[in-house]
Amino acid sequence: MPSVIRVRGARVHNLKDVDVDVPLNEFVAVAGVSGSGKSSLALGTLYAEGSRRYLESLATYTRRRISQAAKASVDEVAHVPAALALRQRPGVPDVRSTFGTATELLNHLRLLFSRVGSYLCPNGHRVPPSRNVALEVPLTCPECAESFYGLGAEEMAFNSGGACPVCEGTGVQRVVNRASLVPDESLTIDEGAVSPWGSLMWKLMKDVAREMGVRTNVPFRDLSDAEKAIVYEGPAEKRHIVVATKTGGAELDFTYFNAVATVENALAKAKDEKALARVEKYLITRTCPACDGTRLGERVRSTLIEGIDLGEASRLTLTELREWVQRVPGLVPDEVAPMARVIVDEMTEPMDRLVQLGLSYLSLDRASSTLSNGERQRVQLARAVRNRTTGVLYVLDEPTIGLHPSNVDGVLAIIRELLADGNSAVVVDHDTRVLAAADHLIEIGPGAGADGGRVIFQGPINEAFHAPASRIGPYMAGVRRVERAAGESDQGADIDGRGALHLETNQIHTVRPLSVDIPLGSLTAVTGVSGSGKTTLVLESLVPALRARLAGEPLPGHVRDVDAAGISRVNLIDATPIGVNVRSTVATYSGVLDELRRAFARTEEAQAAGLKPGAFSYNTGSLRCPTCDGTGQITLDVQFLPDVDIECTDCRGSRYGAQASQIRRDGLSLPAIMAMSVDEARVAVRGLKKAGAILETLAGLGLGYLTLGEATPALSGGEAQRLKLASEMGRRQDGTLFVFDEPTIGLHPDDVQVLLNVLQHLIERGATVLVIEHDLDLIRCADWVIDMGPGGGMEGGRIVAQGTPTDIAANEASVTGRYLR
């Protein structure tokens, strides 16, 4: 029996012919600084090959219907099991997916209501629970003797027979927002007053309206009520119109679509996101009035267990639901109690595991699309364990993202369960507690990008603590820590001296009324377990309230008061990807390419050829590669196999045509500079003051390893945040509040140190910095901490403690404080 996965000559992304043996049936951690090549080894090599080879064993007909990974750039991967990946950014589910469907707990809950619920007979009488539903025989009403069948579990699903007929199981209604149909009533219909007729319908609809008796040459506000009624609600009647053409005119019989019908017609025909986006601006979304957002039909909602229906049970938090279902066997008649106990026992283990993973505050009706990446990944993790597979390689990409330190033990327990079932686990992570719990460590580095891609340590975890080559070992051993500049942290918030932002709110969601001060000119961390109210406090209350106050607009409804205290600008820096396609690169986003294009247009060769700066754009310029249109890659549609994106064979990924390589500045062409890293390009742009300053800033942000031509959507969350900060680094920040949402996501402790230096630079320039954070190293370095909790959901929503990190550590009520001691 092989004991290791044998990898030889791995060259995925920046890996440099890596040879490594990955132990099977063990907890293997993969570490390294951001951009070192960790994910390239774990996901790009091990998972890609494990999943691809498994899929290749399936029939061709089956493979056509499954998205497949391309073959990894590697010489040999031997003894790799079938692989499953739990990615850092799971796909966003559709509108019909909920926390209940994703965890499959809703399946059990539907079965419980189907089998032991109390039904209404067709005449409206309540019928007590009976085994008849399970036996598939009719129920008989004790009052009117009417016989009828109960509902099966599938018939209670909002994705099938149990759906509300009004909203079709979505829980919401999209209705036309009449106020958006005519945004400017000073315009005439001929001038485009009726907006959807211009963007969603043929423009000749105004001609049809004229034939319907509506004046189209007067301002809309001056139309009579009858004319406006025709515009908004007129009947779908045919009218004879004459349409101007190049040869004179054409006569047509055309059916009238009023403004509301135009939007409804476009919505019904929308088949993709692009089409839906065109319609969205004319719609408002509201809770379905028929089912009150439960998604369920009337008969499903009429089935009760001790006065609670399926919709109400789905709105309970996981903690509340766990307590309620345990009581159900004692609440129902003895006839069905054993059946209830079996169903409840099936629910108990998955619920306990989800609570262990810190998801106790979520309810089953919570839309999956509203869950964070970390929450969705933990749902995946819980499902993986419940499947009880064996012989599978699980590749976990940073499973502790967005996880409070108190829930890390839950993740580790699940990884151990996977191993106990006979599986192997490869975990990419930066959390030193996770790494220290592993059996084996593979560390990639030593640096990022071109400076990484090599194995700098491999072996048992205890050997890494003192290995000279390891960069993570000293952090795991506790001999090295992330530190802020001497004398800056833990000095407290000088609220009296510098002033403070002040916010007062009423209750919203599970967050109680709050009154909070955030010191100016300081680094403040907002902490707390998942669901404790951090996001609600900062992103749903403070940020929109400040922006409204600065714009002179009304405050959000739940905000009682906000004192901006001299803040004149709010800058939210989050980890969302930059751009949506490969045309956005580091050079374009940072502004470096703009100056490079102007510089190359000034060269003698360019002037002789009559080339302007626009010609050097790989998106629209004449010098872009004609084969790939400036994307650097082409997509091959191979039948029976997945689409393959390959490097453009003509430009070799440079995005430029051959002529661009002939135009040189200081001996270098623009394609050659675009292929350089930020650090390398700093030398190549000598004499270009603005470009040089931008590159210096990027290097100071720890992004020196990125290539100028690297597509921004491929950057990690941490890289995206720092790139967004680049434009802010060189100027005064007086009166600016920077808000960061978990800026340490995906960061190695060395990268956290770089980030902390950046935050300190902003503060020294006059800024106030507020971070939502779980990382203990950054929290220890804050001036002020606001700890939310103590739990998640209904058990949270309060400020448990405020003060310096030392104050929080000494507070017995603070869950975060326990991990700061």
Model segments located where?
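Conserved phosphate-binding elements of NTP-dependent enzyme cores
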Residues: 1-821
